[in-house]
């Protein structure tokens, strides 16, 4: 009589069957989760296609005519706008990030009054852009603004018309942008500083390292990657900053303080939709390399 196959729980056959059933069950469960995951992604994908991909594609299609770019490049305001944009981005980003790096070290202090200052420091970023920038515009009013009123009370002379001078107007636009966004980048770099082990600074102090040496050999090597990534992202956001210029100066005086983010509105007001779209397309060569470099940094 041939021997019968054992089917006890401890037998190898039973274990193999149980393992196969378990693997199939896990595979079935994984497939179910993947199916429902795709179902839940569909609404977001549709929203992205309808409200992002379609408008961008349609705008590029409308701006396809070479004549639009010929007329755009023939407009002297466009070249002034390009120069303004370069100045706005280079000055704002560098000042903002250097100040954020310095202030992130200051706010590491654990004293109670530093904590109060840190809470107050967040307010410009927490408050919406429109009231923040409009309040600065009211302060700069040449007739009843608080700045000119203070100048008159102290000197007996009328203050300048701040926003009627292109250089001053663009400078105050950069100041408004820095004031609004500086708290955010300070928080980012503060988080980076807090991630550095305190033991490294303690060991450096024992070795007699100065504050500058600690920054040079401990802080900066640990934060250089975060600083670079933050700078690239800040450049992208600064290129797209519409509120700081438009709400403060409206592109004036005489359309001399426009940046690429606001130039399209000028052409729309003149009923030149093709030039408005062309001015946006021209900004893409500035933005896309930054986005590409940013994605490469994040993928490492």
Model regions and ranges:
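Transmembrane alpha-helical segments of polytopic membrane transport and secretion proteins
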Residues: 1-41, 112-114, 294-300
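A structural signal for multi-pass alpha-helical bundles of membrane permease subunits
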Residues: 33-300
């Amino acid at each position: 009589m041939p021997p019968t196959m054992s089917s006890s729980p401890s037998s190898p056959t039973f274990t193999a069957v149980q393992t196969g059933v378990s693997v199939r069950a896990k595979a079935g469960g994984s497939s179910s989760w993947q199916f429902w995951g795709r179902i839940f992604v569909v609404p977001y994908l549709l929203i992205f296609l309808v409200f992002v991909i379609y408008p961008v594609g349609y705008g590029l299609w409308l701006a396809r005519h070479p004549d639009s770019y010929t007329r755009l490049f023939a407009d002297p305001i466009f070249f002034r706008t390009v120069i303004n944009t370069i100045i706005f981005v280079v000055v704002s980003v560098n000042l903002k990030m250097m100040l954020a790096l310095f202030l992130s070290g200051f706010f590491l202090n654990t004293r109670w009054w530093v904590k109060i200052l840190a809470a107050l420091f967040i307010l410009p970023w927490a408050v919406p852009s429109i009231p923040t920038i409009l309040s600065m515009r009211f302060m700069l009013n040449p007739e009843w603004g608080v700045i000119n009123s203070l100048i008159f009370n102290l000197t007996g002379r009328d203050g300048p018309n701040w926003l009627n001078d292109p250089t001053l107007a663009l400078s105050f636009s950069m100041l408004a942008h820095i004031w609004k966004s500086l708290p955010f980048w300070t928080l980012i770099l503060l988080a980076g500083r807090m991630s550095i082990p305190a033991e490294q600074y303690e060991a450096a102090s024992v070795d007699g390292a100065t504050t500058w040496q600690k920054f040079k050999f401990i802080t900066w090597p640990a934060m250089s990657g975060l600083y670079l990534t933050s700078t690239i992202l800040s450049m992208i956001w600064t290129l797209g900053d519409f509120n700081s210029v438009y709400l403060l100066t409206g592109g004036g005086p005489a359309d001399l303080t426009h940046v690429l983010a606001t130039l399209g509105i000028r052409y729309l007001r003149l009923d030149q939709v093709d030039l408005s779209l062309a001015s946006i397309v021209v900004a893409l060569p500035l933005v896309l390399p930054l986005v590409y470099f940013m994605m490469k940094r994040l993928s490492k």
